[in-house]
From Swiss-Prot:
This is UPF0597 protein ASA_0240. GO terms for biological process: L-cysteine catabolic process to pyruvate. Belongs to the UPF0597 family. It comes from Aeromonas salmonicida (strain A449). GO terms for molecular function: L-cysteine desulfhydrase activity. InterPro entries: Ser_deHydtase-like_asu, UPF0597.
Amino acid sequence: MRNTAMKAQWTDFITLLKREVVPALGCTEPMSVALAAANCRKLLGQTPTRVSVWVSGNLFKNGMGVGVPGTGMIGLPVAAAVGFTGGNPDAGLEVLNTLTPAQVEEAKALLPIIKVDVKDVPDVLYAEVLAEVEGHSARVVICTDHTRIVLMELDGEVLMEQNSAPGVQIQPAKSDKPAMTLREIVAFALEVPLAEIDFIGAAATMNQALADEGLQGYGLRIGKILTEQVERKLLSDDLMTLAMRLSSAASDARMDGAMLPAMSNSGSGNQGIAATMPVVAAARFLKASDEQLTRALVMSHLVAIYIKTHQNKLSALCAASTAAMGSGAAITWLLGGQFEQISHCINNMIGDVSGIICDGAGSACSMKVSTSTSAAVKSSLMAINNLHVPQSEGIVSDDVDETIANLGRLSKLGMLDTDIEIINIMRAKQQGKAQ
């Protein structure tokens, strides 16, 4: 350890990884609604006769068409219903980890009394659930982060509001200015004592299990189809195909409601998959050691977190594409690249896939995960041959940290109208179905 400041930063990096890389069962936006509903039920102590759910436009977008684990159904009303009947209010993003078939049947009976609408709020991630029965009511609000409960009310009395309640731990919102650089991340991943980061191996284990499940056939079956084409000799059994197969299979299973958790990144299972499975595939293909895989995963997940800190929690930019940039960096290192080549890889990816929109969570996410994975491998292969997008083009800069900041600016400022129109289109579709 060269100095005290570095030791403190490395400690911060480890804390950040442990906070942002956590298990999550099901797509995280519907799970926020389920978690709010589970806490409402805990406060109310009985089954409600009327439930109102309000969400931000972005949460609506990511919850409209995605599968809810263990139900075989999609959508925010379903998430709220099973949150009431079987949600564990203390389980965070694994709120539905003990859901039973009987509780799913109970939830179906609640669907007619649940109304979901979009609320005009400043937070892009916002979920509010109000449950009522026989003159009693309970209200729970989650905002900023998927499990950050900021308000609990029972019969109009505030029980907890932000940090005011003793014993209630709430994660602070992230700083707008990331306290890290790519060079610092790479140095940490390669130099930190292995014993301090071996916990990241759980990401490989957990997301590999999800990929194995996805290969059985979920959602759009991208992973299964790609595997079948390898067997038919229509696709090569190479690094890029293996990475696409594993990544898309895990996403297939996750978005179709498989009852297996994903190791998430920055509050998203697909981001966790995109930051994990391409690296696992590369390590397997290249016969990397366990230590190399561990360090590569740390690099990938920290890069994904770093890039995400420049963006809103939810936006019009596909975050799986940016999380895969972490995988690209790690694969470049596994292929023998140094910091310069790792920088080239990220610049290549930003020059390639930075325009992929997020039009809500759903089965098509696995297509975007596989596309971003292929871009990660392609950009890595270019980078180790010192080929890269020149700084004279688009939003790419010679300074990779500046390029990342430019991407964040595009997401936070340039794509606001895009986000609004995506949400408007999706709301119009839903209203058309309701008529």
